[in-house]
C-alpha cells in the first residue's frame, strides 16, 4: 500500500493528478507538465519532496563514518555546508547519490532518494563503526522545494534575512518561517536557483500555504513529478535507477568531480581504482531525427549496438528531444553521430555536451 506525504490533502485540493511513485502517492502534475516546467525556468515552482529520506549520523566518529561511506571528501566542510556524493558498494557500483549536510562536527544529515530509503538505511547501519549513531527521521520531516528565478524574492518575503543561505550548497538551521522552525537550504534538482525547506511533518501543509501565498504575486505555481523529471533531465542531473545503479560506477556516470581518490579510503575505492579509466560513460544525445528516445532504447553506430538510453524526453524549455545514454568511451566525443532504435525505427542523434541547459 502506498504512503501519503504530509501534503497529500494539499495536492488533492489543488487538483493534482495523483500517481504512485517510490511507494508514495504524489502529484505527477497540476496544470500540465509543460506549464509547470516553464514556470520553474522563467518564474518559480513549488514541489513537495517529502518522500525523500532523511537520516542522522551523530557522535564523535560521525565524520569518520561519513568519510568511509561516501566518495566525496568531507574533511574541510564548514558547519552549514552541503555536499553531494555517490555512496558506493564494494564493487564500485552506486548504492545511492546523497546530499550530506554538516550540522556540526558530530552531526550530519543525509538526504537520500525515496526509492532507496530502506536499502540505504540498512547499508549505512551495516557499515557504521566506532562512536556513532544512526537515526532514520524521514517520517517526521516534510521537505518543500522552491525553485526558479523568483525564488530569492519569494523567500525574502517570509524568511528572516539571516535565515537565507547566501552560498550555493549551504543551509541555515532553526529558521523561523512565520512560526515554523525550518532548515533552509540553497539546493535543488532542477538546474535553477532555488531553496529547499525542511520542517516537522505536521507543519508541512502550513508551510506549503505560506510559500504559495508569498509567491502569488510572482506567478508561483505548484509543480509535480513530471516537471521535476523534465527539469532535471534538461539540467543533465542523473536519476537513480536510470543513470545511476549498483552496477554503474561514479566515473562511468560522469561524477568524477565527486570522487576523491586521494583521500584515505571509502567503500568501493579499491574497486574503482582497479577498474581504471571507464570503458563506458554517460553522454548527452540531441535527437536530430523525428521521434523521442526513451529509457531502454538501444543506441547504434551503423549496425552495431553500442549502448542504451537511460533517460529521454522532449524538453519544454529547449523545445527539443534530448536523451542521456551509456555508450563506450570511443563513441563519447561531442559531435559523434549515432542512431537510436525507437520502437523498431532508427532515428538519428548526435553526442552533445552536458548539461543541455544551464541557467545564466
Description of each model-found segment:
Residues 73-120, 126-127:
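Well-ordered mid-protein domain cores that form the structural environment of catalytic cofactors
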Residues 60-94, 151-180:
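Internal amphipathic helical hairpin motif
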Residues 33-42, 87-97, 128-130, 176-183, ...:
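Short amphipathic beta-strand starts and helix->beta connectors
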Residues 1-28, 103-360:
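Conserved, structured C-terminal
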Residues 1-85, 93-95, 226:
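Acidic, proline/glycine-enriched N-terminal capping motif
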Amino acid at each position: 500500500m502506498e504512503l501519503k506525504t504530509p501534503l497529500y490533502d494539499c495536492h488533492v485540493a489543488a487538483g493534482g493528478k495523483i500517481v504512485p511513485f517510490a511507494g508514495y502517492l504524489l502529484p505527477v502534475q497540476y496544470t500540465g507538465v509543460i506549464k509547470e516546467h516553464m514556470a520553474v525556468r522563467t518564474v518559480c515552482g513549488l514541489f513537495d519532496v517529502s518522500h525523500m529520506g532523511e537520516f542522522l549520523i551523530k557522535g564523535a566518529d560521525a565524520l569518520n563514518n561519513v568519510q568511509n561511506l561516501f566518495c566525496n571528501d568531507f574533511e574541510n566542510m564548514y558547519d552549514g555546508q552541503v555536499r553531494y556524493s555517490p555512496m558506493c558498494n564494494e564493487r564500485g557500483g552506486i548504492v545511492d547519490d546523497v546530499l550530506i549536510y554538516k550540522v556540526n562536527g558530530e552531526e550530519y544529515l543525509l538526504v537520500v532518494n525515496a526509492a532507496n530509503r530502506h536499502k540505504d538505511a540498512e547499508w549505512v547501519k551495516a557499515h557504521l563503526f566506532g562512536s556513532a549513531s544512526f537515526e532514520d527521521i524521514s517520517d517526521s520531516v516534510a521537505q518543500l522545494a522552491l525553485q526558479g528565478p523568483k525564488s530569492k524574492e519569494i523567500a525574502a518575503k517570509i524568511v528572516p534575512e539571516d535565515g537565507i543561505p547566501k552560498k550555493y550548497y549551504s543551509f541555515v538551521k532553526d529558521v523561523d518561517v512565520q512560526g515554523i522552525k525550518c532548515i533552509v537550504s540553497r539546493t535543488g534538482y532542477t538546474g535553477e536557483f532555488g531553496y529547499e525547506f525542511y520542517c516537522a511533518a505536521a507543519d508541512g501543509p502550513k508551510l506549503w500555504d505560506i510559500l504559495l501565498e508569498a509567491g502569488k504575486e510572482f506567478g508561483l505555481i505548484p509543480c509535480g513529478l513530471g516537471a521535476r523529471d523534465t527539469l532535471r533531465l534538461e539540467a543533465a542531473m542523473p536519476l537513480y535507477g536510470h543513470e545511476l545503479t549498483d552496477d554503474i560506477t561514479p566515473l562511468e556516470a560522469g561524477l568524477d568531480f565527486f570522487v576523491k581518490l586521494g583521500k584515505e579510503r571509502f567503500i568501493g575505492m579499491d574497486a574503482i581504482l582497479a577498474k581504471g579509466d571507464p570503458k563506458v560513460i554517460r553522454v548527452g544525445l540531441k535527437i536530430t531525427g523525428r521521434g523521442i528516445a526513451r529509457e531502454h532504447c538501444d543506441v547504434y553506430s551503423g549496425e552495431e549496438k553500442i549502448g542504451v538510453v537511460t533517460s529521454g524526453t522532449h524538453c519544454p524549455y529547449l523545445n527539443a528531444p534530448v536523451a542521456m545514454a551509456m555508450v563506450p568511451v570511443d563513441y563519447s566525443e561531442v559531435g559523434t553521430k549515432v542512431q537510436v532504435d525507437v520502437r523498431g525505427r532508427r532515428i538519428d542523434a548526435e553526442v552533445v555536451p552536458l548539461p543541455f541547459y544551464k541557467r545564466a
